[in-house]
Each structure stands twice: as C-alpha cells, then as structure tokens.
Amino acid sequence: MLGRIAAIFGAVFSVWIVSADEPIMNMMPRWKGGWGVQTIFEHRTERDLLLDGRIANKGFSEEVNILHLEGVYTWDKAIRLTAKLPYVINARREMPEDLGGTQRDKGIGDLTLALPLKKYFNLDGRSGSWSFKPMLRVPLSGEDEYEVYDDEWGTGLGLSYEFETYRFILFLGTSGWIYHEDEPFESHSSLDLGYKFEAFDTNGAILWETDFHFEDDGSRTLLAGPALYWNIDDLKHLRIEWKHDFQDRQGVLDHGNGDTFKLSIGWVF
C-alpha cells in the first residue's frame, strides 16, 4: 500500500510536463451559468507491438478512430462540471495468431466526469489560474474482441497551472487515476507553450504540446507535436492537433510507436 501511495505522489508531483484538457478547448466558459459542447474526432495509428523497450513484433499495427462528445457547465467562475463520452467508430489491431490474431472494437467507451475547481489570479502583465480536479470514470464500454477503453470504475485527481500574457500561453497539468479492478495506476502530464495571434477580425494561438503517459506496470510514453486553436467568432471554436510518440516503452505486450491526430469543434453559450 505504501508503495502504491509513493507511486501516486511520485508520478503526480515529479512528472510536471492531458489528458488534462477540459472543454471547451481548456479555456471556456468562464462566466456564471455558461455552458458549452465540444466534439473531437481522434485518429490514432500505432506501428509496432512493443514489450519493455524493444519491438516484440514489428509491423503489427493498431488503428483507432474515436468520436468524443464533451460538455461543460459553469456554476460559478471557480466551479465547473464536465462530462466526456467517447464513441469508438472503429478500432482494429493486429496480434500474433496465438494471442487472437486481428481483433476489432466498436461502440461507446467509458464516461468521465470531473469537477474542476479554479483559483484565478491577475498580475502585472499576465493572468491565469490554479486548478484542482476530482474525477470519476464510469464503465460503459461493452465486451468486444478487444477493448480500447478499460470498462472499469476509476477515481482520479488532476492539478494544473496556466497563465497567459498579451502574446504567450503556458499550461502545466498532471492527473492520476486509480482503477478498482485490474488496471494499473496511470498518470497523464502535459506541458503546453503557445503564441497568440489576431487575423481577419478573429484570434487564436499556435502551440507546441508535450505529453507524458505513465503506468505502474512499466509503461511510459513521451509524445509531442503542434496544435492550432482558432476562436472563430466567440460562439464557435476550432482546434487541430497532431502528436508523435518520440519515446515509447510498454510494460506489457501492447502497441506503440504511433501518431495521433485530433480535430475539435466547440460551441460556447
């Protein structure tokens, strides 16, 4: 038990580099009674089957397409409720024949509920917030040939710090999850750096985002890439991102060495 507690605090406080993203675009709405919805199309490909730090089966790939539906309601500037529900459009992975061969998954994933609590600050030349986020994972994914989502109850905590100046954005976030059955403890941490711009009576930001995923079965993945956020007209918001696995180690036989593309559209009211 003490080892598990140490792993949790070690991952949460020593890996400050998100899954930490919340609707809408991790930014809005900030006003009392505000709400919004966001859809995200995610396409992920992984090229090899890994074990520890080596390729166990080269060319055994996995391809996943997911549609995420997310919503947020702001009771008060400092208190929000968020919900995230993924739907696996199609997923396909290649395994050795003695481990199932080609397998597929499709359907609803697990629901994630969160209660982000924020403390805002305004300083000379910059403004931002600290966030503390309790989270709950609700199992909704059914049985298939294999499961993209865990189909287990889970509880988590998230911490983040963010600020922006007239031109620049910084976001630091980390979250940790404990599952109630067989899944290992996992954490997701993020470091995002951005440059804000105005063009054609709109505004947005160009970002470089670095993520680190850790599981206490020995799995570690470092991925990074560019993102573009565009505030179209205050009501509609667009985001495009791409990330590449620069370092991937799997503690159990699993796919890795991949790329992830996401296209997000959000509406704020």
Positions of PLM-derived features:
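Cleavable N-terminal export/targeting peptides
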Residues: 1-28
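Transmembrane beta-barrel domains of Gram-negative outer membranes and organellar outer membranes
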Residues: 20-172, 176-179, 188-219, 223-230, ...
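Active-site rim beta-loop-alpha module in soluble metabolic enzymes
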Residues: 182
